[in-house]
UniProtKB/Swiss-Prot annotation:
The gene is SAUR67. It is found in: Cell membrane. May promote auxin-stimulated organ elongation, such as hypocotyls, stamen filaments and petals. The lineage of its organism: Eukaryota, Viridiplantae, Streptophyta, Embryophyta, Tracheophyta. The keyword Endoplasmic reticulum does not apply. Transmembrane segments: none annotated. Belongs to the ARG7 family. It is a peripheral membrane protein. This is Auxin-responsive protein SAUR67. It holds the Pfam family Auxin_inducible. It comes from Arabidopsis thaliana (Mouse-ear cress).
Length: 143
């Protein structure tokens, strides 16, 4: 199910307004996606945080990308719409950086579909994976 562009823009604007008090300044680079710990956002960008609390700013044009739409949809399913605070994606920063590189390469349709399927099936949050790691460690200690 695809979210239409108007609805997605409206959702992103709503999330941005709710997160306005928690924003940090971004140092822009040529890659069009930025991470920083300062306090404001450049005009034409929206901000998300990863599960490991790393901040990313994307140009608004990324909202039309189906991968970014899926990430926002997963965030809404896992955390709901934030009433206070920023949009948080249920993935760590390493995974998000990898996705950004794939988006910037403008992959073909088949690759994008495969990536969307893998993202959808990997809805387990960082907390879930940490829990699994903890259980694995406990099992090793028992053996």
């Amino acid at each position: 199910m695809m979210i239409n562009a108007k609805k997605l823009m409206k959702m992103a604007k709503k999330w941005q307004q709710r997160a306005a008090l928690h924003r940090k300044r971004i140092s822009f680079q040529r890659s069009n996606v930025f991470t920083s710990s300062s306090s404001t956002v450049e005009k034409g960008c929206f901000v998300v945080y990863t599960a490991d609390k790393i901040r990313f700013a994307f140009p608004i044009s990324y909202l039309s990308n189906s991968i970014v739409q899926e990430l926002l949809k997963i965030s809404e399913e896992e955390f709901g719409l934030p009433t206070e605070g920023p949009i948080t994606l249920p993935f760590d920063s390493v995974f998000l950086e990898y996705l950004i590189k794939l988006i910037q390469r403008r992959m073909d349709g088949d690759t994008e579909k495969a990536l969307l399927m893998s993202i959808s099936s990997a809805k387990c949050s960082l907390q879930c994976s940490l829990l699994q790691q903890e259980q694995s460690t406990q099992q090793l200690l028992v053996l």
